[in-house]
């Protein structure tokens, strides 16, 4: 049975929006640098990397919607960090943002790399933004790039 994937192949031309929260800045900044490195490593020139900063995770979806109003934006990478507090605030934010980002990707036909950390502790977030567990900025960017390559092959 023939199969295809997006691990190799050509990328379409266009801009990639990297939309990142300023909240929990040290964690998000590390993920931004990792995502930018992944894009550069994949051959996306710096002038095609559109970095958009938003206040927090809640605003990621709005910025994706605005970025996708530009026809030359071929995909987005969303980066943020929500750390559990004493209330259920984090659960509401995490669910709403996750659901909306998936809906935006499906509706627009453009991939959205999901780099929203949903951690119980600051230490967990640090470990996932360049620590022992890796960097979700790389993972979100690499997933979006793979989906762009797959999309190119499926057309």
UniProtKB/Swiss-Prot annotation:
A GO molecular function term, named singly, is:
6,7-dimethyl-8-ribityllumazine synthase activity
Please list the residues that bind 5-amino-6-(D-ribitylamino)uracil: 23, 57-59, 81-83, 114
Output the GO biological process annotations, alphabetical, semicolon-separated.
riboflavin biosynthetic process
Task: Name the catalytic site residues.
Answer: 89
Key word Glycoprotein present: no
Highest taxon, organism lineage: Bacteria
Listed pathway(s): Cofactor biosynthesis; riboflavin biosynthesis; riboflavin from 2-hydroxy-3-oxobutyl phosphate and 5-amino-6-(D-ribitylamino)uracil: step 1/2
| One cellular-component annotation, GO | riboflavin synthase complex
Q: What is its EC number?
A: 2.5.1.78
Q: Which CDD domains match?
A: Lumazine_synthase-I
Q: Name the keywords, alphabetized.
A: Riboflavin biosynthesis, Transferase
Does the record bear Transferase in its keywords? Answer: yes
List residues binding (2S)-2-hydroxy-3-oxobutyl phosphate.
86-87, 128
Q: Which reaction does this enzyme catalyse, per its entry?
A: (2S)-2-hydroxy-3-oxobutyl phosphate + 5-amino-6-(D-ribitylamino)uracil = 6,7-dimethyl-8-(1-D-ribityl)lumazine + phosphate + 2 H2O + H(+)
User: Which Gene3D superfamilies does this chain map to?
Assistant: Lumazine/riboflavin synthase (3.40.50.960)
Task of the protein: Catalyzes the formation of 6,7-dimethyl-8-ribityllumazine by condensation of 5-amino-6-(D-ribitylamino)uracil with 3,4-dihydroxy-2-butanone 4-phosphate. This is the penultimate step in the biosynthesis of riboflavin.
As for family, the record states: Belongs to the DMRL synthase family.
HAMAP family xref list:
Lumazine_synth
- This one is known as 6,7-dimethyl-8-ribityllumazine synthase
Q: Which organism is it from?
A: Rhodopirellula baltica (strain DSM 10527 / NCIMB 13988 / SH1)
Gene giving rise to this polypeptide: ribH
């Amino acid at each position: 049975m023939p199969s295809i994937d997006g691990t190799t192949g050509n990328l379409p031309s266009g801009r990639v929006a990297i939309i990142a929260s300023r909240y929990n800045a040290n964690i998000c900044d590390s993920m931004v640098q990792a995502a930018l490195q992944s894009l550069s490593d994949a051959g996306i020139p710096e002038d095609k990397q559109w970095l958009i900063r938003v206040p927090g995770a809640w605003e990621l979806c709005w910025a994706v919607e605005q970025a996708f109003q530009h026809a030359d934006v071929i995909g987005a990478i969303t980066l943020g960090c929500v750390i559990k507090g004493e209330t259920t605030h984090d659960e509401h934010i995490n669910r709403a943002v996750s659901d909306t980002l998936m809906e935006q990707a499906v509706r627009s036909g453009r991939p959205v790399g999901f780099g929203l950390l949903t951690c119980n502790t600051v230490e967990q977030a640090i470990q996932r933004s360049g620590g022992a567990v890796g960097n979700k900025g790389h993972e979100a960017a690499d997933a979006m790039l793979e989906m762009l390559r797959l999309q190119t092959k499926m057309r």
